[in-house]
From Swiss-Prot:
This is Galectin-10. Regulates immune responses through the recognition of cell-surface glycans. Essential for the anergy and suppressive function of CD25-positive regulatory T-cells (Treg). Keywords: Acetylation, Cytoplasm, Lectin. Gene3D superfamilies: 2.60.120.200. The keyword Cytoplasm applies. The record marks 136 as: Not glycosylated. One of its GO terms (molecular function) is carbohydrate binding. Expressed abundantly in the bone marrow. Expressed exclusively by eosinophils and basophils. Not detected in monocytes and neutrophils. Expressed in CD25-positive regulatory T-cells (Treg) (at protein level). Found in intestinal tissue from patients with Celiac disease, expression is directly related to the histological grade of mucosal damage and to the number of eosinophils found in the duodenal lesion (at protein level). Found in sputum of patients with eosinophilic inflammatory diseases such as asthma (at protein level). Interacts with CEL. GO terms for cellular component: collagen-containing extracellular matrix; cytosol. It is found in: Cytoplasm, Cytosol; Cytoplasmic granule. Residues 6-138 form the Galectin domain. The modification N-acetylserine is found at residue 2.
Length: 142
């Protein structure tokens, strides 16, 4: 299986029913506190506002947030850690009418209420201390 480059950036437009699927593996053991970060940007540049920020400090915590007009908002933190040390993971972020639902290895693990409409997303970036084997955006068929 070939690896995708990290950081990985792709243009995307999201709406209710869209799902972003990411498959990868932490590059270091959890004792070294590797990170995974997924950002849904409003423009095709890293400095743009972030509709949804999802950051995992493997083995410790998950932080979710948004950045509006250049300022971070109130972060939501969870100690729920469904990721396994040294194991491949599949992360799916689904756009629901009022929130994002985050699944890890097929299990509902986190939710984050919309602060900025998902239709504002123009780019998804996946980065930090992971090897990345899959990135896909699927859309609800109408």
């Amino acid at each position: 299986m070939s690896l995708l480059p990290v950081p990985y950036t792709e243009a995307a437009s999201l709406s209710t029913g869209s799902t972003v699927t990411i498959k990868g593996r932490p590059l270091a053991c959890f004792l070294n506190e590797p990170y995974l970060q997924v950002d849904f940007h409003t423009e095709m540049k890293e400095e743009s506002d972030i509709v949804f920020h999802f950051q995992v400090c493997f083995g410790r915590r998950v932080v979710m947030n948004s950045r509006e007009y250049g300022a971070w908002k109130q972060q939501v933190e969870s100690k729920n850690m469904p990721f396994q040390d040294g194991q491949e993971f599949e992360l799916s972020i689904s756009v629901l009418p009022d929130k994002y639902q985050v699944m890890v290895n097929g299990q509902s693990s986190y939710t984050f209420d919309h602060r900025i409409k998902p239709e504002a997303v123009k780019m998804v970036q996946v980065w930090r201390d992971i090897s990345l084997t899959k990135f896909n955006v699927s859309y609800l068929k109408r």
